[in-house]
Amino acid sequence: MKHLRIIAIDIGNSATNLGLFTGDRLERYDFLPSSPEYSEKVCQLIESWQPDFHHIVIGSVVPALGDLLETRIKERHNTTPMMVEDFKTELIPLRVDRPETVGVDRIVNCYAALRLFGAPAIVISLGTANTFEAIDAEGEYIGGAIAPGIKISLET
């Protein structure tokens, strides 16, 4: 049985992480600064990894950079990336007053926690911002909090 080959791109506030997966196995990984100047380098990395992938999936907390990379990939690789923003509410039920305000990074982290460990869960992500998420016993996102990351906290 042939496994799907997927390139996953995670655009954060500070870094863009790329991974090439065959099925559940991570085959290649790289990261670059999150900046428009690096969109060409992302396309070059995709080309160097191997052209026979099935999908590219982009999750971005920097909408302008996600849109730019989507456009560049369409032009360079003749494929339309899947944007997590377009289907984020299908990954996990969001039982909060304003689900549109929950970032794709937070939703994807919770989805991964559910797949790997099950519910209930507390999901913590430390980065430019630190996020804390709660998933109830039914596997539903019930809320979270955002705090400044370590570097930002040390600077203030």
What spans do the regions from the language model cover?
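Conserved phosphate-binding catalytic cores of ATP/NTP-utilizing and phosphoryl-transfer enzymes
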Residues: 1-3, 91-121
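N-terminal glycine/serine-rich phosphate-binding loop of ATP-dependent small-molecule kinases
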Residues: 1-7, 11-89
